[in-house]
A protein has these predicted regions:
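A short secondary-structure junction signal
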Residues: 17-19, 44, 79
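Phosphate-bearing ligand-interacting subdomains
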Residues: 48-132
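Glycine-centered flexibility sites
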Residues: 8-13, 41, 87-90
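Short secondary-structure boundary/capping segments
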Residues: 21, 39-41, 99
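N-terminal glycine-/serine-/threonine-rich beta1-alpha1-beta2 phosphate-ribose binding loop
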Residues: 13, 25, 32-65
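Glycine-rich adenosine-cofactor-binding loop
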Residues: 1-26, 30-36
């Protein structure tokens, strides 16, 4: 399996780990990272949670190639350099701040707010201009 880490173990990070845990996919969340002393050093949904200070070391030890960023939006830009330095090859970013990486690192910025606004826009359009099928 391809090993994944979750950066930020708030509500979203924990929901992501719960969702993927035990799915039997070829993707496996093997580590989580946070800075909250209440979370660091604990196992959350079967996944060990490390402090961000040990990010590069854990990524190397666990052969992690993809990260899911679910940190607070204001923290997300500070994660770019550690992600690059650790040799991560893929990023799924769930924050509302688009993250930019050098060529060679695959990035998917997934802003749920923007997507919801898009859906709301089209719902409103359909209500204002109903089509007769």
């Amino acid at each position: 399996p391809m090993n994944i880490a979750v950066l930020g173990m708030g509500h979203l990070g924990q929901a992501i780990t719960k969702y993927f845990n035990g799915k039997g996919l070829k993707l496996k969340i093997t580590a989580a990272f946070d800075v909250d002393p209440e979370k660091v050093g604990k196992t959350i949904d079967g996944i060990p949670c490390y402090h961000m200070d040990s990010f590069e070391e854990v990524v190397e030890d666990k052969d992690i190639s993809i990260v899911i960023v679910s940190s607070p939006t204001k923290v997300a830009p500070n994660l770019v350099l550690p992600i690059i330095n650790a040799g991560i090859r893929g990023v799924l970013n769930f924050t509302s701040t688009p993250l930019n990486f050098p060529q060679g690192i695959i990035v998917e910025n997934y802003d749920i707010t923007t997507l919801l606004e898009k859906v709301a826009y089209f719902v409103k359009e359909n209500e204002e201009n109903p089509t007769d099928d």
